[in-house]
Curated annotation (Swiss-Prot):
Belongs to the zona pellucida-binding protein Sp38 family. N-glycosylated. One of its GO terms (biological process) is acrosome assembly. Disruption phenotype: Male mice are subfertile with sperm showing reduced ability to penetrate zona pellucida and displaying subtle morphological deformation, including shortened apical hook, smaller apical angle and bulges in acrosome region. It is found in: Cytoplasmic vesicle, Secretory vesicle, Acrosome; Secreted. Keywords: Cytoplasmic vesicle, Glycoprotein, Secreted, Signal. GO terms for cellular component: acrosomal vesicle; cell body; extracellular region; membrane; zona pellucida receptor complex. Residues 1-19 form the signal peptide. The gene is Zpbp2. It comes from Mus musculus (Mouse). This is Zona pellucida-binding protein 2. Glycans are attached at residues 86, 220, 256. InterPro entries: Sp38-bd (IPR010857), ZPBP1/2_C (IPR048805), ZPBP1/2_N (IPR048806). Is implicated in sperm-oocyte interaction during fertilization.
Length: 326
């Protein structure tokens, strides 16, 4: 039996009748430096960075004589190519399979010559470009939902039974997505509507979460597990919306004068997305305005031990992505 039909059968029997992100990307996905202040770059975990160019846009559009490039990493050591670092002979840097420890300040010293046409006098010019590169991941989504049902009274076992049956139906509706209902609660209130007597209504709230038992099996072949869980919980949200939409449809089209005393209140379904960040990551719209919706790796001096969205201060932390304060 369909879930929406099952719920109405229960109601009737109970109550009866009644990527990368940066401020200086160009259309080719390159990021140029800026003299005087660092350019912030955000690289999704396990992905490759954009191409970092050891020049500003103005210099890149001019002839450059005898250029040399020297890249240094977050530890101020000279960078050399390896499995995670690719440096070209034209000064382009790409960071591959990006992880938290790769976050930090990357600097490039560009040296080149200017030559006077009349005298052939050479002058050495040096420019330094800084890039602040941060690992980020998408937040883990869950959804807070609220609905209302009419009831005949705020006392009696029918309200508890409806609450338990509704939770079970909703859990079954989304179980194949490895999502489940958590933190369910309800309160009974009496409501006065214009030109009507008092009504008793159950105000029901719950959260739809993508981490039901067994959810880790989804991540066996994917480094970006939150992409999978977020997709699943979005589908779960859509199923919930459709379920309660059908409740309203049944009420308006399948009942004439007699309706169950306990029934869904039309237009009462409300949904709000909740974002959580994995340990070692957090949100900071002021510091990371170009990646305001991202969970960005916690910088040195901060940490995040849980799924909160804020990196907390800890002066003894000297690494990116700290999950504890020593």
């Amino acid at each position: 039996m369909l879930a929406w039909a099952l719920l109405y059968a229960v109601l009737w029997s109970l109550a009866g009748v009644g990527s990368q992100r940066s401020s200086l990307f160009n259309i080719k996905g390159f990021v140029y430096g800026t003299v005087g202040h660092p350019v912030k770059i955000y690289v999704k975990l396990h992905q490759a960075s954009p191409v970092l160019i050891c020049m500003d846009i103005d210099r890149a559009n001019k002839e450059t004589v005898d250029p040399t490039y020297l890249w240094t990493g977050p530890n101020e050591n000279t960078l050399k190519g390896n499995s995670q670092i690719n440096i070209t002979n034209t000064g382009e840097l790409v960071l591959k399979d990006f992880l938290e420890p790769l976050s930090g300040l990357y600097s490039c010293m560009l040296s080149y010559k200017t030559i006077k046409a009349e005298t052939q006098e050479e002058t050495m010019i040096k420019k330094k470009y800084d890039f602040l590169v941060f690992a980020y991941r998408e937040p883990d989504y869950s959804y807070h939902m609220a609905v209302r049902f009419t009831t005949g009274s705020c006392v009696g076992r029918h309200n508890d039974l409806l609450f338990r049956v509704l939770k079970k139906i909703l859990d079954n509706l989304i179980s194949d997505l490895l999502c489940h209902v958590i933190e369910p609660s309800y309160k009974c209130h009496f409501v006065k509507l214009p030109e009507r007597d008092f009504l008793y209504e159950l105000f029901i709230a719950f959260q739809v979460n993508p981490f039901a038992p067994g959810w880790r099996s989804l991540c066996n072949r994917s480094a970006d597990c939150e992409d999978i869980t977020n997709h699943n919980v979005l589908k779960a949200r859509d199923r919930m919306e459709e379920f309660f939409r059908k409740q309203a449809h049944i009420l308006h089209h399948h009942f004439n004068r007699t309706v169950p005393a306990m029934h869904f209140v039309d237009h009462s379904f409300q949904v709000t997305r909740i974002d959580n960040c994995r340990p070692g990551f957090g949100k900071n719209e002021g510091l990371h305005s170009n990646c305001a919706t991202c969970c960005v790796v916690c910088s040195p001096g901060t940490f995040s031990p849980d799924v909160d969205v804020t990196c907390q201060i800890c002066v003894s932390v000297h690494i990116y992505g700290a999950k504890a304060c020593p």
